[in-house]
From Swiss-Prot:
Transmembrane region(s): none
Keyword check for Nuclease: yes
Protein family: Belongs to the XseB family.
Record's catalysed reaction(s): Exonucleolytic cleavage in either 5'- to 3'- or 3'- to 5'-direction to yield nucleoside 5'-phosphates
Organism: Mycobacterium leprae (strain TN)
Subcellular locations according to the entry: Cytoplasm
Protein known as: Exodeoxyribonuclease 7 small subunit
Cellular component GO terms, alphabetical: cytosol; exodeoxyribonuclease VII complex
Record-linked InterPro entries: Exonuc_VII_S, Exonuc_VII_ssu_sf
Pfam family, one: Exonuc_VII_S
Keywords: Cytoplasm, Exonuclease, Hydrolase, Nuclease
GO molecular function: exodeoxyribonuclease VII activity
Length: 78
């Protein structure tokens, strides 16, 4: 049973969407692979939850930007 797996310590709020997504994929892979002790599994799971939330924030921001541009375009065309 492995007790140490490197966990990225970069603050999540400093990661872009792609970096969050890629790290989240790696966290899921490690958890699905198994062989980690409980403490490491919990740390990875917590990091994964934070990464998933940050990915959603990035996607929400992108959706809002698209909506703003489309709304501005409609106003210009009116």
């Amino acid at each position: 049973m492995r007790s140490t797996t490197p966990i990225n310590t970069t603050p999540i709020n400093q990661l872009g969407y792609e970096a969050c997504r890629d790290e989240l994929i790696e966290v899921v892979r490690l958890l699905e692979q198994g062989g980690l002790n409980l403490d490491m599994s919990l740390k990875l799971w917590e990091r994964g939850e934070q990464l998933a939330k940050r990915c959603e924030e990035h996607l929400d921001g992108a959706r809002q930007r698209v909506a703003d541009v489309l709304s501005a375009r409609q106003v210009e065309e009116a």
